[in-house]
Each structure stands twice: as structure tokens, then as C-alpha cells.
């Protein structure tokens, strides 16, 4: 790799490589997919406070891209495993790269701290696979009292399209619930642009997809 995008450099991974006049440029589009999916639902991460559950690949990409795109505060919660240490390393990088974004990392075994951080957050993100088929009966949030009318709840899980987390958040009256299927679409849109230099006909794709799901 000759160069890396800011997100790829901070994360230390790429999923899209573009040859620009003989120079190989590495990009990471997962976080872009998340941010653009939110924008597609009328939500901008700029100026927002987020709580992200998980510290795996998808959660890390989301954390980094949201910081780069202007989030003011990100609280990461993960079990006490090697991913927790990696999250702390990423947070340290972001402190240098994006000093205006306050990134903190917490262990998930402190439900009181999790509730406290969600109470201060604008957006709650499930960046784990909890709730993915065949475990649709699971949710990363067991205390439904954290849901409130002005909280936006997002899930990276795309199957089912509405997870238990999103369903319970909606039933509790949360402002918006956003599933993970759109994240897949928008990271593909970003990759399409990088590969071709053209804008992907997103609305045509959405129409085609809707017609073929009937």
C-alpha cells in the first residue's frame, strides 16, 4: 500500500484498494456506510454524542468515521477481552488525530456506567452481532429504561432488518431506529465511487431491490 485514507490509517485495515496512476491507495468504507446510512435517514453525526456497543471491526470503523465526521463524544463499551485493549489503542490515536472528539472506552460489565453514558448520548449504536439470525431473540440492551423519546438507536445487524433492539426501542418511543441493511448499501456506494469515479444510481437500486422483494 502506497497511501491510506485517514480512516484506514487510524484503523489499520483496508477493504477497498484503488490504483491511482500507479499508486495503490487503501480505504475503509464500512464507517462511511454507517454515516451515510444515518444521513439517508435524516441524521448527521456532526456535533452528536454516541455510545457504541462493541469494539470489533465494524464498531471500530464506525467509531473512527464518526470522529472524523464531527462527532463530539464517543463512548465505547466492550467486554473485557483483547478487543477492549484494541479499542483503547484506537481511542489514543483519535485523541491525536481528532482532538475535538472525546473518545472513552469502558468495560461492558458496568451496567450503571452504560446507563449513565446512554442518558447523555444522542445516538446508541449496536456494533456487535447480538440479535443476528439465528439469535433474533437477543438484544445487547437488557435495561429498556435507557430508551427515551429523543434517542436515536442504530444496529449494524441486517438480518433480521428489525432486530429485537430496534423493535424495543421503537416500542419505547425512541426518536428513530435505523437498521444495518442500509450500511451495507452505502459502503458499497462509497466503494463504487472510489472504483469508478461515478455516483452509483442509489435510488434506481433501491427501486429494483424493493420490486424484487415482493
What do the predicted segments below correspond to?
Residues 1-41:
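Phosphate/diphosphate ligand-binding glycine-rich loop within oxidoreductases
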Residues 20, 43-49, 147-149:
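Short helix-loop-beta connector
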Residues 28, 47-67, 71, 78-79:
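Glycine-rich adenosine-cofactor-binding loop
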Residues 33-38, 44-45, 57-64, 93:
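Active-site glycine-rich loop that binds ribose-phosphate moieties when present
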Residues 52, 76, 153-155:
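Structural beta-sheet core signal
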Residues 69-99:
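NAD(P)-binding Rossmann-fold cofactor-contacting core
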Residues 100-177:
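Rossmann-like adenosine-cofactor binding region
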Residues 152, 156-214:
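Adenosine-phosphate binding glycine-rich loop
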Amino acid at each position: 500500500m502506497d497511501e491510506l485514507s485517514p480512516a484506514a490509517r487510524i484503523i489499520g485495515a483496508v477493504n477497498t484498494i484503488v490504483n491511482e496512476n500507479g499508486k495503490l491507495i487503501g480505504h475503509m468504507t464500512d464507517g462511511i456506510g454507517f454515516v451515510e446510512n444515518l444521513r439517508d435517514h435524516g441524521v448527521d453525526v456532526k456535533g452528536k454524542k454516541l455510545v457504541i456497543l462493541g469494539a470489533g471491526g465494524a464498531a471500530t470503523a464506525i467509531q473512527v468515521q464518526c470522529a472524523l465526521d464531527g462527532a463530539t463524544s464517543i463512548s465505547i463499551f466492550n467486554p473485557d477481552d483483547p478487543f477492549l485493549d484494541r479499542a483503547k489503542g484506537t481511542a489514543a490515536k483519535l485523541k491525536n488525530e481528532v482532538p475535538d472528539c472525546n473518545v472513552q472506552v469502558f468495560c461492558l460489565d458496568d451496567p450503571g456506567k452504560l446507563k449513565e453514558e446512554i442518558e447523555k448520548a444522542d445516538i446508541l449504536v449496536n456494533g456487535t452481532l447480538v440479535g443476528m439470525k439465528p439469535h433474533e431473540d437477543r438484544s445487547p440492551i437488557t435495561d429498556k429504561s435507557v430508551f427515551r423519546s429523543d434517542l436515536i438507536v442504530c444496529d449494524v445487524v441486517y438480518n433480521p432488518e428489525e432486530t429485537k433492539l430496534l423493535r424495543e426501542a421503537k416500542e419505547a418511543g425512541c426518536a428513530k431506529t435505523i437498521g444495518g441493511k442500509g450500511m451495507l448499501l452505502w459502503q458499497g456506494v462509497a466503494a463504487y465511487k472510489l472504483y469508478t469515479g461515478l455516483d452509483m444510481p442509489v435510488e434506481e437500486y433501491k427501486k429494483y431491490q424493493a420490486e424484487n422483494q415482493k
